[in-house]
């Protein structure tokens, strides 16, 4: 059966824990505090006892009548001729003269007694309340009246009745000793009279009902007012006591200082007298010494150093040194030591005679209304926060059933339960991770709605290889960037900004090759509008479909630009029909996508395309807050030999300034310089503006988010923390050998690997190369990218390649002279490329050559042994004749006897007559010897063969 704590029961029924504990003790339950547990049946008993106490039944109402209490602060209005009682009105409590009220009530009751002529004792006193009792007769009331003069006996009787009262009135008995003392005092002052209140002389059945709830509310209000007055009085008394204690401390301090000064004067006088006595003693000692020396000189014989010997003594001490003078010096030292000792005693006496410092009283601190806690706080920390002693909290925890010391950590539930016991609202502290950059992008409160302004749209151009993406962007920028691209492929994302009709548009150019899937996905994630360019003569291609999927995943609108309409084989209608199969439906067909037919080469309909972009941007309502600290995304990153790490950033919110402390991905730094898309230095960059910055300590990854921090210290801490987390995550991803994956590990050991080190000019090319090489499928071989980074090939790359037996692949970079010299010395291969599919083809060939060769057996010829010759120290020589094919010197041979192979090995020698030959042809004779085999016999068949490697296709 489950148990409940008393404070939980009190919370359920709306009572205080103290009342619930008293009820439980009265019912005979073994409880100690509000944290004690009881069975569920006992809990029901406690709850039922409260319901009985608050709503008495018919029997109780017949046996005991509650006695009205004079309540000057409560006004009860009754209707004439009805038993309805109006709602009580509680006035503001005022200070009362209880003694005067008691005397007035006694006089009023005496007057009523004389007016009525007969008195009936109908009320008894219980805990300060008058209760009607139908079991008491008028005769008993008269007896009580006659015994009222016996003060001591009546007092004892009242206490006895208060202790033996019926259990149906437990709610009144819980008032305690305070109400019993009121009962004694009220009895002595004549409050126990046998008169009923005015209007109560009619029979009980006709008496109006008593509104117990109103009385209880009035009594509660009176008790609260009294408690507030007592609290105020107690507070003032404490303040007065503190003031008096402070005065007493000041007086004691002054008295101690005065006593100390007097003691110092006495000590100085004593020291002066001691010094005078010592000087007198010294002078007397010196005079005595001089007289003794003179006497000794007269008596002694003239001898050298005679004052230091004793000739008058007998035995061992004769003719020995006399230490009288030294003893005198010692005595003098001892006297000085005693003087210092007395002085020290005097100092100690000063400390002991000073008045003891008064014990300072502990200041009373109010409990806080709220308490913000963190998981794992210790008892000492909680005590310091709420300004309480740790021992007090340890005691409370012990009463709650929790054994803890002041240095022990507590969980959140225990802290909340402890704060509930103190009456404090507990709240868990929300930890803010300063190293989390993503929270700036997700927090809606980061932007100020009052400062929101319209921003330029970010447009990404996507499409298949050589469909005219870079040519279109080149036409927009009036430059010829496209002609310089290697192999007709854009190698990395370029971000550019143009102005049309007074409004700015930011363009992102993405590569179209299959290797740059991640770069296209990154471009779609930061864009607002996608321009899908499709060649009118080629139609929909694989990368076109991929671009459609990226745009749909990013949830951005698509504008289709049908390019190359100037070519003879252009068919725009076919392109529209093919795109409709993938959900890209033109507005002319009832869809949502805008289609524009252009010719990027001849600058045809380009203005119409830009107008369409601005129209879609206006519909999207693109907004930004330029007043907050800047956040955005890394478009590209590279390592420059002279400038260090360079990152191309796209500002999405806020304004980026020079010298701003910034965290980019897992690195940090301060913006040293900013360059826009035209190569000009700028001091700030507003939302939707692409800029290249320097000043980072490391090269970030393309696609990382960046955020500006308040100061460099916070940025450094966040960057270092993010770097540690990335390193820890990388270590966790490293698989270790266990019994579960042991078989997979052994199986993986059978697969050959080609180790490569990739160095490229930009981070996007590094990612594309690594992804493409890993995807190469050659059975039994896989590519292992040992290291990849941006920048030139240096000596450390060559050292790593030598240690890991790897090939260095440089993409649009060159090795340093020192690295090239070291590579020649260490025999490390360096391959340099500028077109990505050439790299893929070369690595694929290397992977095929890495496999173990597959050999096929090829029979060269057969021979028959005609004669055998045994030569000592040489072995058996077999004379043979070739019957088919030929026998070569480097071939392997099998010895077949009776169609059974009895030996397989290599030839030791092959001769034609006496000459060593490389081969013996068909129908020719010769002699041979076989390595490690001498059991040749006549008519044995010799089969010659070689193992030939099969070329992989």
UniProtKB/Swiss-Prot annotation:
GO cellular component, one term: cytosol
Residue spans of biased composition, Basic residues class: 339-348
Region called G3, residue ranges: 509-512
GO molecular function: GTP binding; GTPase activity; translation initiation factor activity
Annotated TM spans: none
Biased composition (Basic and acidic residues): 80-89, 98-111, 140-188, 300-317
Name of the protein this chain belongs to: Translation initiation factor IF-2
Gene this protein is translated from: infB
């Amino acid at each position: 059966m489950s148990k409940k704590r008393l404070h939980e029961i009190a919370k359920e029924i709306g009572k205080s824990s103290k009342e619930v504990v008293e009820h439980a003790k009265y019912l005979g339950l073994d409880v100690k505090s509000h944290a004690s547990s009881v069975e569920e049946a006992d809990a029901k008993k406690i709850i039922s006892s409260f319901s009985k106490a608050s709503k008495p039944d018919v029997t109780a109402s017949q046996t005991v009548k509650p006695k009205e209490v004079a309540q000057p602060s409560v006004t009860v209005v009754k209707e004439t001729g009805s038993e309805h009682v109006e709602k009580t009105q509680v006035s503001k409590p005022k200070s009362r003269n209880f003694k005067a009220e008691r005397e007035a009530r006694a006089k009023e009751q005496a007057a009523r007694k004389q007016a009525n002529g007969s008195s009936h004792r109908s009320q008894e006193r219980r805990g300060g309340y008058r209760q009607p009792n139908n079991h008491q007769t008028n005769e008993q009331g008269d007896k009580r009246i006659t015994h009222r003069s016996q003060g001591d006996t009546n007092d004892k009787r009242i206490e006895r009745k208060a202790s033996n009262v019926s259990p149906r009135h437990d709610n009144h008995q819980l008032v305690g000793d305070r109400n019993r003392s009121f009962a004694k005092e009220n009895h002595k002052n004549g409050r126990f009279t046998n008169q009923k209140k005015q209007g109560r002389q009619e029979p009980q059945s006709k008496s109006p009902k008593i509104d117990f709830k109103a009385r209880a509310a009035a009594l509660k209000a009176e008790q609260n007012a009294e408690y507030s007055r007592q609290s105020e009085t107690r507070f003032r008394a404490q303040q007065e006591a503190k003031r008096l204690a402070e005065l007493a401390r000041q007086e004691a301090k002054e008295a101690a200082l005065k006593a100390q000064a007097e003691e110092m004067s006495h000590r100085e006088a004593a020291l002066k007298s001691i010094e005078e006595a010592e000087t007198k003693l010294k002078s007397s000692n010196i005079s005595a010494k001089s007289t003794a020396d003179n006497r000794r000189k007269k008596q002694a014989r003239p001898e050298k150093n005679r004052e230091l010997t004793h000739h008058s003594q007998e035995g061992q001490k004769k003719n020995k040194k006399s230490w009288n003078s030294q003893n005198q010096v010692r005595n003098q030292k001892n006297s000085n030591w005693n003087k210092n000792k007395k002085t020290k005693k005097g100092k100690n006496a000063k400390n002991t005679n000073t008045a003891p410092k008064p014990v300072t009283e502990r200041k009373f601190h109010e409990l806080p209304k709220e308490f913000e806690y963190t998981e794992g706080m210790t008892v000492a920390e909680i005590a310091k926060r709420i300004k309480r002693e740790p021992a007090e909290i340890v005691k409370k925890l012990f009463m709650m059933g929790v054994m803890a010391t002041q240095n022990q950590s507590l969980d959140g539930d225990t802290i909340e339960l402890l704060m509930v016991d103190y009456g404090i609202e507990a709240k868990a502290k929300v930890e803010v991770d300063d190293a989390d950059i993503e929270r700036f992008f997700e927090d809606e409160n980061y932007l100020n709605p009052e400062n929101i302004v319209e921003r330029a749209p970010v447009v990404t151009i996507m499409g298949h290889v050589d469909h005219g993406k870079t040519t279109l962007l080149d036409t927009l920028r009036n430059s010829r960037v496209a002609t310089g691209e290697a192999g007709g492929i854009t190698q990395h994302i370029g971000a550019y900004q143009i102005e049309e009709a007074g409004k700015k548009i930011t363009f992102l150019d993405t590569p179209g090759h299959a290797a740059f899937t991640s770069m296209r996905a990154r471009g779609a994630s930061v864009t607002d509008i996608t321009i899908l360019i499709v060649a009118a003569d080629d139609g929909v291609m694989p990368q076109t479909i991929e671009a459609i999927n990226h745009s749909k995943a990013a949830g951005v609108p698509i504008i289709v630009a049908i390019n190359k309409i100037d070519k003879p084989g252009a068919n725009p209608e076919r392109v529209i029909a093919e795109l409709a199969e993938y959900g890209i439906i033109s507005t002319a067909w009832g869809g949502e996508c805008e289609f524009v037919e252009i010719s990027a080469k001849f600058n045809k309909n380009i203005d119409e395309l830009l107008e369409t972009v601005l129209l879609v941007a206006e519909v999207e309502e693109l907004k930004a807050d330029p007043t907050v600290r800047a956040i955005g995304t890394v478009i590209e990153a590279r390592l420059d030999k002279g400038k260090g790490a360079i990152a191309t950033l796209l500002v999405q919110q806020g304004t980026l300034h020079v010298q701003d402390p910034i965290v980019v991905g897992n690195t940090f730094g301060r913006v040293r310089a900013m360059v826009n898309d035209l190569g000009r230095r700028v001091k700030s960059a507003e939302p939707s503006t692409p800029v290249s910055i320097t000043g980072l300590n490391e090269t970030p990854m393309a696609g990382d988010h960046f955020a500006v921090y308040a100061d460099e210290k916070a940025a450094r801490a966040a960057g270092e923390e993010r770097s540690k987390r990335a390193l820890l995550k990388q270590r966790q991803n490293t698989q270790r050998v266990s019994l579960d994956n042991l078989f997979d590990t052994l199986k993986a050991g059978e697969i050959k690997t080609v180790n490569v080190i990739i160095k490229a000019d930009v981070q996007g090319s590094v990612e594309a190369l690594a992804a493409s090489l890993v995807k190469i499928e050659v059975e039994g071989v896989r590519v292992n990218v040992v290291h990849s980074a941006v920048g030139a090939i240096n000596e450390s790359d060559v050292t790593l390649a030598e240690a890991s037996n790897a090939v260095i692949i440089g993409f649009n970079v060159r090795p340093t002279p020192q690295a090239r010299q070291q590579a020649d010395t260490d025999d490390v291969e360096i391959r340099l490329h500028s077109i990505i599919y050439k790299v893929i083809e070369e690595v694929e060939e290397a992977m095929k050559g890495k496999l173990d060769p597959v050999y096929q057996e090829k029979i060269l010829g057969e021979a028959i042994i005609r004669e055998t010759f045994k030569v000592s120290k040489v072995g058996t020589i077999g004379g043979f004749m070739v019957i088919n094919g030929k026998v070569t010197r480097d071939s392997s041979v099998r010895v077949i006897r009776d169609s059974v192979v009895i030996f397989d090995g290599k030839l030791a020698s092959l001769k034609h007559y006496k000459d060593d030959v490389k081969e013996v042809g068909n129908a020719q004779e010769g002699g041979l010897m076989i390595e490690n085999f001498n059991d040749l016999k006549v008519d044995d068949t010799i089969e010659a063969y070689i193992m030939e490697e099969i070329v992989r296709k």
